[in-house]
Every structure is written in structure tokens, then in C-alpha cells.
Amino acid sequence: MATNKRDQLIETAERLFYREGYHATGIDRILAESGVAKMTLYKHFKSKEELILAVLERRHQLMFERLRERANKLPPREALLAVFDGLHTMIHGSEQYCGCLFVNAAAEYHDNEHSIHRRSSANKAELQAYLRELLERLAAPQPQQLARQLQYLLEGALSMAHLEGPGEQARDAKDAAQVLLKGAGI
């Protein structure tokens, strides 16, 4: 629950951007649903793009807080596999699963140099670095390559859940991840 007007705007915008898309959601709709005045919005954000970046940053921070929390509580192999469990929970936890907020943003802002596309790409790069870090703690051979392969499984599960609707995508990806880890001697 939002504790201030800025957070209220970000939460409302995130919900609308996720369900309806970035370009399809106008500032007036965000203001109407958040109950925040236009002047307040522009006090906190110079533009819609700045609001989108704040939404992506908030989601990124929450995601990595959860990942790091798990990594601190679990051995590295279990923490790696817990990412797939978290993905399953995320896919099944929303009323209407609409894919990955970051992939959706990159799709709508497809220019690789656009700040929104770059922020989305940075999220994926940080996820890969997180996976690599856990693999390095396990002394995995070729940790960068294995991190990419695990990420492809995660991204594939996200995409297929968006296309097919929530199902067993994350659990199937977790099974494939276990095969990859076993093949790497982990």
C-alpha cells in the first residue's frame, strides 16, 4: 500500500501499464485511478517516461530484494532453483498474467538506445549476473554460459505463460534447469 502520493502514482501506473500497456495508458487515466492531482504528478515526475522508469526501478528493487533474501537463506543450488519457484508464484499470483513488465516495456520502447529499453535490458543483465554469482559460488564450469542458459529457461517460461496462460511453465523450466545443473556436475 502506498505511503505517499509518489508511491501511489507508481503503484497505480504499474498496475495499469502491466494490464493495458505503456502506450495505451495515458496520464489522465493514472491520475483518475490514483486520485492524485496533475500538479503533484509533475512535481515528482517530469514526464510519463520518467514515471515508467520509476515503475521499472521499483519492480526491479522488489525483485532483487526477494532474490537476495532467498540467496541469504538457502545454499546456492537451492537459491538458483528457488528462482523458478518464485517465477511460478508470480505467474499464478496475479489475477491476469500479462507477461514480464520489463519485456513488455522493451517491446513497446524497442529502440535499444531508449532509456526505458535500456532499463529493461539492465534488469535482465542483473538477473544473469545474479545467476552467475550463485554458479560461481558452486564452482560451476563456465558459469557465464550456464547463467545464460538458465536465464533462457526463465525467459521462455515467462513468454510461454504469457502466450498460453498460466500453467506449469516455470516448473517445467525448473526441471530443465536441474538437468542443466546435473550436466554441469552441480
Q: What are these regions, as identified by a protein language model?
A:
Residues 10, 81, 125-128, 132, ...:
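An amphipathic alpha-helix signature
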Residues 5-13, 30, 55-59, 63, ...:
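Generic hydrophobic, amphipathic alpha-helix propensity
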Residues 8, 12-50:
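Helix-turn-helix
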Residues 54, 68-97, 137, 147-150:
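Hydrophobic alpha-helical connector segments
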Residues 1-4, 185-186:
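N-terminal intrinsically disordered/low-complexity leader segments
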Residues 113-122, 137-184:
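Hydrophobic/aromatic-rich alpha-helical bundle segments in the mid-to-C-terminal region
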Residues 91-118:
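Amphipathic alpha-helical segments used for helix-helix packing
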Residues 48, 55, 59-63, 83, ...:
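Hydrophobic/aromatic residues within well-ordered alpha-helical segments
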